[in-house]
């Protein structure tokens, strides 16, 4: 199969593209096929084409919170990074954003408007689509608290507007995970009318707190493990003596133990083996099994 563009579009269809540059960990093999749609119709066309060809579909936003196998990803990988549109409704205080819009940029934009509600997303290295799927959260807030609805591309290729209450939200999860339902845009309910200077200051404080406590000098995927009930994953890992522990070129961060760093030249298998080692060591010490927040994509057998 040799195609320059998706059928009926001007959207380039690329073959055997390294995904390392599409992830915040800078690891991973090649996508069998890769497409970077700039519009919702192009994304629909990509989805329908993959279904017609019998290809599995993987969606990437900012490439955080995921680990791509060194063996690559079969089928079609859809990058949403160009779906970055944003509209505001000044009367209702609602904000509608494309799935590829970066969360830090969104926080700064709403702060400039004097709209409260998304100050906490400023330090999350992800996109709107990923936040909706994962119920991203920080500083005691999460996506589900402000989300009104999402536009979903359903498995049959149709679009549906789905209310937030129908997305089955819980801690760092939704019923969109492990499905072929794709988030295309989200509408949030914010609180307009505040002093922009004050909202900017609060946003900057959240960012400063994250920069002070979390590692940003090396590639990483964000928090690796979910916090078990009654515990924090970082504390458990630190108390197990694993800060700085390294397999290959992947290392448990000295600054925050719930982060794994690519210290230069790490492979996805280095990271994977380190994740498994940490899980086993913590379970042996505390009888607590750490469940990954990071999503594994591809074959790690």
Swiss-Prot record:
Gene Ontology annotations for the cellular component aspect, listed alphabetically: cytosol
FAD-binding PCMH-type domain ranges (all copies): 26-206
Pfam families, sorted: FAD_binding_4, MurB_C
Cofactor(s) it depends on: FAD
Subcellular location: Cytoplasm
One of the record's GO molecular function terms: FAD binding
Keywords for this protein: Cell cycle, Cell division, Cell shape, Cell wall biogenesis/degradation, Cytoplasm, FAD, Flavoprotein, NADP, Oxidoreductase, Peptidoglycan synthesis
Active site residues per record: 172, 223, 293
Domain of life: Bacteria
Catalyzed reactions: UDP-N-acetyl-alpha-D-muramate + NADP(+) = UDP-N-acetyl-3-O-(1-carboxyvinyl)-alpha-D-glucosamine + NADPH + H(+)
PROSITE patterns: FAD_PCMH (PS51387)
SUPFAM superfamilies associated with the record: FAD-binding/transporter-associated domain-like, Uridine diphospho-N-Acetylenolpyruvylglucosamine reductase, MurB, C-terminal domain
GO term, biological process aspect, one: cell wall organization
Known EC number: 1.3.1.98
Biological pathway: Cell wall biogenesis; peptidoglycan biosynthesis
Primary role: Cell wall formation.
Family per record: Belongs to the MurB family.
Protein's name according to its UniProt entry: UDP-N-acetylenolpyruvoylglucosamine reductase
Organism, as annotated: Thermosynechococcus vestitus (strain NIES-2133 / IAM M-273 / BP-1)
Highest classification ranks of the organism: Bacteria, Bacillati, Cyanobacteriota, Cyanophyceae, Acaryochloridales
